[in-house]
């Protein structure tokens, strides 16, 4: 009874996560008692739980920062906004997956369980305040992502992607845990983040070699989750081999959660070593922007191209992490991350829809698509232009604000490189856009010739199209309504 009262006292702060846990239990029960394999009730339960969690989180928005469950979780505006981002990702990815699951005739229950579990792990990771909870939440997110990548068991490419993802993910987690063990030992046996800092000061180990080594290990572990160069090797293969809706999910969810973790870990644990980890992050960001954009130019697979594009995009976002000491550093990172979620998911919704109708992922096979499906063409064009940063779309204003904050923070070497590589990215985005409106060798490809779409092509009829339109609108309107978004982001603190 005492434990139950304690849960009621502290549980309010993690009520959104509790709703997701309840939905997981209900989903399993419905699957056990239902004779129908893919009952619509499963979608209803999952989407209702996610919407309820979003509403609860919005009601908790202005509450005072609090540490709950013996300082295991820390709830504040910074953590809440990243928890909200993860819920938005899941809320968009489930409708995006409905038609895919129906067409491929794969099991729905497992898919929803993995999505909800990964969402739960990501949300806990955003507010975890000790090393053990961080690792458990990270593995909850990671293991669910591994299982999702191998969701289509009979697909050889999916199995290969899962194996690569699992092996490299396990290696990065091992490195991260070793970094945690060094912090635990150097601080005199502390696991809570702020107590680790106090312990390091007490043991006079704060500027020791062991502390620097632990920082390197943490950077490697987090770099894998963020797909930063040179820890990106898994990304193209996993993106290409995994089911497209699954790629859409962990291309944003894992990055949101890992970004929240990296920002909190480095700013809380290494405040006096900021020069060192800022320099290391700058090197990784520059490598990611240059390598990601140059290799993306050579790709012929749409998913591999988006994989390298995502590597370069996270390089841009790192500018906001490094510039966090300025007044607008966090705000620029948060603003661009929100815009990136919609741009990226909108693009993946487009290629999911095209893949279901044609069965191909080759960029050349998109030639002449505008003659058959103007809605899909327009949506893909707007999302790609927004990713490239073309005004007046939201991607332009997000990048402009991000680069301006970086310049204001004194990143005079990093920002010009970001601007230059952003121009390079426009080449492969515009190359695809040109292809959509032209015919290959003056004739349509066999895939476009056999492309079937109803006469009411401009009216959305499927859940993928509805998700696609929501993402396209959200990738466009914030360019006009950017000031309120920035104002909300500027009120976000640890």
UniProtKB/Swiss-Prot annotation:
Membership in a protein family: Belongs to the complex I subunit 2 family.
Described function: NDH shuttles electrons from NAD(P)H:plastoquinone, via FMN and iron-sulfur (Fe-S) centers, to quinones in the photosynthetic chain and possibly in a chloroplast respiratory chain. The immediate electron acceptor for the enzyme in this species is believed to be plastoquinone. Couples the redox reaction to proton translocation, and thus conserves the redox energy in a proton gradient.
Gene that this sequence comes from: ndhB1
BP terms from Gene Ontology: ATP synthesis coupled electron transport; photosynthesis, light reaction
InterPro entries assigned to the protein according to its UniProt record, in alphabetical order: NADH-Q_OxRdtase_suN/2 (IPR010096), ND/Mrp_TM (IPR001750), Ndh2_N (IPR045693)
A Pfam family of this chain: Proton_antipo_M
Transmembrane segments: 13-33, 39-59, 81-101, 107-127, 131-151, 166-186, 211-231, 243-263, 277-297, 305-325, 336-356, 378-398, 411-433, 468-488
MF term (GO), any: quinone binding
Cellular-component GO terms for this entry: chloroplast thylakoid membrane
Enzyme class (EC, first level): translocase
Record protein name field: NAD(P)H-quinone oxidoreductase subunit 2 A, chloroplastic
Subcellular location: Plastid, Chloroplast thylakoid membrane
UniProt entry keywords in alphabetical sequence: Chloroplast, Membrane, NAD, NADP, Plastid, Plastoquinone, Quinone, Thylakoid, Translocase, Transmembrane, Transmembrane helix, Transport
Membrane topology: Multi-pass membrane protein
Catalytic activity: a plastoquinone + NADH + (n+1) H(+)(in) = a plastoquinol + NAD(+) + n H(+)(out); a plastoquinone + NADPH + (n+1) H(+)(in) = a plastoquinol + NADP(+) + n H(+)(out)
